Design a protein with these regions (language model features):
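Contiguous, well-folded functional domains in the mature portion of proteins
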Residues: 1-218
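Ser/Thr-rich, Proline-interspersed low-complexity disordered segments
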Residues: 220-249
Length: 250
């Protein structure tokens, strides 16, 4: 689909906003189940259960804390900061799966272009980053990071083609569309809202069909502030509006 705006300011593989391996993460001890957290509910948030076909609540295998990023470190683009512990103490979740199981797009009602609901911000063989906007940035809207997965070769090839062509277009996906598979007994996922890493265990936002299984309540976190945007490239071109390219079914 045509990219509407935004700019990473860096090649996607060099940006800690898209390539989660640059930030990294550490294991943490936490409750491995759905939780209730007070505060506003995210209307029409991506539903992680839909990453499985048919949708389900998987067993949670482990919890992690993603590292913050310090943009002021020298040389640019900065350096890894401390592990994120606020506003949420869990920011990456390992979920059980079956080796060879197909993985789908976490569903959302609001389309971004035609019938598409998500756009690929970054892809490599074992990592995928999706945004639920048409911005070439995670600063607005929802972003989902998948780690330790197998991205479909067709999707990866299309992403590399459009990335090399200047990112005026990027691959997009529909609800129910397969983008890859799990080749091991688990994979990891993180979810962000306007750049902030959220708690992926929260049932009122990411697992709404399973709220009856939420029996553990956590304290409401401090106010969540939008991310500090990554520095824009000084000569970043304005996104053009060419004929959209549709992602082939993997």
């Amino acid at each position: 689909v045509p990219v509407e705006g935004g700019s990473l300011g860096l090649p996607a593989d060099k940006s800690p906003d898209t390539n989660l391996s640059l930030r990294g993460y550490r294991p943490t001890t936490a409750y491995l189940g759905l939780i209730n957290i007070g505060g506003d509910t995210h209307d029409d948030a991506p539903q992680l259960a839909a990453a499985f076909g048919p949708p389900r609540l998987p067993a949670f295998a482990a919890a992690f804390q993603v590292y913050d990023w310090n943009w002021n470190c020298s040389p640019p683009p900065g350096c890894r900061g401390d592990a994120l512990t606020t506003p949420y103490s869990v920011t990456l979740l390992e979920m059980r799966t079956t080796p060879g199981e197909q993985l789908l797009v976490p569903s959302r009602k609001q389309p971004i272009y035609g019938s598409f609901v998500a756009m690929v911000l970054y892809a490599e063989e074992r990592r995928l980053t999706l945004t639920y906007t048409r911005d070439d940035s995670p600063a607005n809207g929802y972003v989902v990071h998948f780690e330790d997965v197998v991205v479909a070769p067709e999707l990866l090839a299309l992403y590399r083609q459009l990335n090399a062509a200047g990112r005026k277009e990027l691959p997009a996906l529909r609800n129910g569309e397969v983008w890859g598979m799990a080749d091991k007994a688990s994979f990891k996922a993180a979810i962000r809202d306007r750049g902030t890493f959220m708690d992926p265990r929260t049932c009122k936002d990411w697992w709404v069909d399973y709220r009856s299984q939420c029996t553990v309540s956590m304290a409401r976190p401090a106010a969540v502030f939008p991310m500090q945007p990554s520095p824009a490239a000084p000569t970043a071109p304005t996104a053009a509006m060419p004929v959209p390219v549709q992602t082939p079914q993997p």
